[in-house]
Amino acid sequence: HLNQNYSILTQLQAFALDAHFLIEQSGRNQQGAFINFNGTAGIWRKSCILDAGNWEEDTLTEDLDLSYRAQRKGWKFVYRPEIKSPAELPPILSAIKSQQFRWTKGGAECAVKHAGKILKENHPLSIKFHSFAHLFNSTIFIAILLTSFCSIGLWWGVQLKVIPLELFWASGISMIGFVLVAGVYLVSYLTAQPYSWKSILGAVWKLPLFFSVSMGLALHNSQAVLEGLTGKKSPFIRTPKFNLESGSVSLQANAYRLRALPMSTLLEGGMGLLFGGMVLLGIVYDNFLFLPFHGLLALGYSLVFISSLRTR
């Protein structure tokens, strides 16, 4: 990551991408499961591309689409995590949003295109399972959005004593998944750099902030996923590149910056206020059941909203 230390946003992106490349991609490849070709550092055989049907333009993630078509025909990818390729991370939130929108919507489009075919084809059960989880992984943002709204109703239900407190504690089983996901990111982060107290302290603040910002992108990314699943088409929006290594490039002058303020940005500001209000209610009424969750949501949506206003 050429500009990993440029800002908190770039550090959080590096934190997430290291987990993807070091654990997710490596794990799938070692198990013989389908993985996605990475355009930053990947080499195709021309014969593979042609045999798989060449590039197609019916999804926003044409690399993921071609990867699945090739692997479904029996081609194998060789993943080499020790080989590094320099790449720039989006330094502003509008660029991150456009990239996230393309990735999540394109992933959903590929899920619609390939998931059913993979289930019908003669692949091992493990490959079908991993492929289904991989193709539909962007739906996690819809789950986050629904869970955040449901948490408000559950909080009021417990507060008004119309929902048994035991129901809340039963929902705590979801923490198992949270711990597992957190473990993946911690392992990848500590593996990607020299082990030291500095790296450990870095993980302490990056992990919760990463989860918070990811939650803050749930509204934006859920829209992308729903559009992908329902077949709504949209143009390919290029991720801006700023050449920050030169030290003389203005972020404001980039031609690919988003100038207009989307309605979703205003809704994100409203979500920040909503969950900030839930945090205050929890403190006022001594009902701290969802305080950490609502706190992360309030912080995440507020950061996304403010950063969107500053960098459009």
Segments (PLM) and residue ranges:
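Long helical/loop segments within the catalytic core of UDP-sugar-dependent glycosyltransferases
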Residues: 1-60, 72, 93-132, 136
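Hydrophobic, membrane-facing alpha-helical anchors
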Residues: 127, 131, 163-164, 243-251
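Membrane-embedded multi-pass helical conduit in multi-pass membrane proteins
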Residues: 137-235, 241, 262-312
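Membrane-helix boundary/interface segments in integral membrane proteins
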Residues: 231-258
